Amino acid sequence: MSIRVIYPGTFDPITNGHLDLLSRACALFDHVILAIAESPNKKTLFSLNERVDLAKGATAHLNNIEVTSFHGLLIHFAQQKNIPILLRGIRSLSDFEQEWQLCHMNHRIMPELETLFLMPSEKWAFISSSLVKEIAQYRGDVSAFVPDCVKEALLR
């Protein structure tokens, strides 16, 4: 039996923390879908297509990953893909509180949906896309936090 999971998020932009979680997920599961949310209620730096392209570039070294985008509710995307497992990363207690609510709301709507949580490696536990964007906005060096393709995009 092939175990497939969806790792959803905005990924604006994808960071080394995301890549750490993805590489570990690829070792645990047969197929990982990196599902990039349109997120119309969020003000994103990169367009949906740019975020997909950056994620594809950053994950090219991973064999069992598929990068795609989705619109609307994540549970509808999971149903469409026939994948009942979500993978989420938790860096902090505040992440846990938000993920706990989402997990239970999703489960209430789609009872067969399970959410698995992975803690980041200690090296990447403090990184967030928001912090990376703020550092880049003031022309700080983000090379330790993002893959090269993202660094180049942030410098444009």
From Swiss-Prot:
GO terms for molecular function: ATP binding; pantetheine-phosphate adenylyltransferase activity. Gene3D superfamilies: HUPs (3.40.50.620). InterPro entries: Cyt_trans-like (IPR004821), PPAT (IPR001980), Rossmann-like_a/b/a_fold (IPR014729). Its EC number is 2.7.7.3. Its cofactor is Mg(2+). ATP binds at T10, F11, H18, G89, I90, R91, E99, W124, A125, F126, I127, S128, S129, S130. The keyword Nucleotide-binding applies. One of its GO terms (biological process) is coenzyme A biosynthetic process. Reversibly transfers an adenylyl group from ATP to 4'-phosphopantetheine, yielding dephospho-CoA (dPCoA) and pyrophosphate. NCBIfam families: coaD_prev_kdtB, cyt_tran_rel. This is Phosphopantetheine adenylyltransferase. The lineage of its organism: Bacteria, Pseudomonadati, Pseudomonadota, Gammaproteobacteria, Enterobacterales. The gene is coaD.
